[in-house]
Structure formats: C-alpha cells, structure tokens
Amino acid sequence: MRLLALSGLLCMLLLCFCIFSSEGRRHPAKSLKLRRCCHLSPRSKLTTWKGNHTRPCRLCRNKLPVKSWVVPGALPQI
C-alpha cells in the first residue's frame, strides 16, 4: 500500500516537472542558410595570374526576423 502511494506521488511529481520545464521554452532554432555575397563595386575586381577577373565572395547569412517568445497554451492578450 505504501509502495503504491509513493510510486503514484513520484509519477505526479515527474509529470509536473515535465509540464513546467517546457512551459516557456523557445522553439529550436532553424539552421541558417548560407549563400555567397559578392561585392559588385568596380574596385573590387581582382585578377588572377591568367588575367581573369574574379569577385571577392564570402559566405553570408540571411537575416531572420526576430520572433517573439510564444508560451504554449497561453491565451492572446487583448
């Protein structure tokens, strides 16, 4: 009888911990898509040893809009 009560109490405690630990958690961040940024200014034209023009390119990150923190199950504020 005592074991049954303790195991039920432990299950309730574990359930409450799982619910409250994920209450205000943000969603996992999505991976940022990288693309090449090439500058188009005329002074940035580099020449290789063969004489071909190249543009200095680097990897750029797309700026994602800032998302507000959403609490799951919360009612909208009016």
Swiss-Prot record:
Assembly: Interacts with SUSD2; the interaction is direct.
Gene disruption phenotype: Gpr15lg deficient mice in an imiquimod-induced psoriasiform dermatitis model develop less intense itch phenotype than wild type 1 day after imiquimod treatment and afterward, and display less severe capillary leakage and less skin hyperplasia after 5-day imiquimod treatment.
GO biological process: defense response to fungus; defense response to Gram-positive bacterium; G protein-coupled receptor signaling pathway; lymphocyte chemotaxis; mast cell degranulation; negative regulation of cell cycle G1/S phase transition; negative regulation of cell division; regulation of keratinocyte proliferation
Keyword annotations: Antibiotic, Antimicrobial, Chemotaxis, Cytokine, Disulfide bond, Secreted, Signal
Disulphide bridges: 37-60, 38-57
Full protein name: Protein GPR15LG
Signals that turn on the gene: Up-regulated by Imiquimod in the skin.
UniProt GO MF annotations: chemokine activity; G protein-coupled receptor binding; receptor ligand activity
Origin superkingdom: Eukaryota
Signal peptide: 1-24
Tissue-specific expression: Highly abundant in the testis, colon, eye, and tongue. Detected in the epithelial layer of the colon, but not the small intestine.
InterPro entries: GPR15L (IPR031713)
The protein's role, per its UniProt record: Highly cationic protein that has multiple functions. Acts as a chemotactic factor that mediates lymphocytes recruitment to epithelia through binding and activation of the G-protein coupled receptor GPR15. May be a tumor suppressor; together with SUSD2 has a growth inhibitory effect on colon cancer cells which includes G1 cell cycle arrest. May regulate keratinocyte proliferation. In addition, through activation of Mas-related G protein-coupled receptors (MRGPRs) contributes to pruritogenesis by activating itch-selective sensory neurons and mast cells degranulation. Has antimicrobial activity against Gram-positive bacteria, including Staphylococcus aureus and Actinomyces spec., and Mycoplasma hominis and lentivirus.
One CC-aspect GO term: extracellular space
Location of this chain's protein in the cell: Secreted
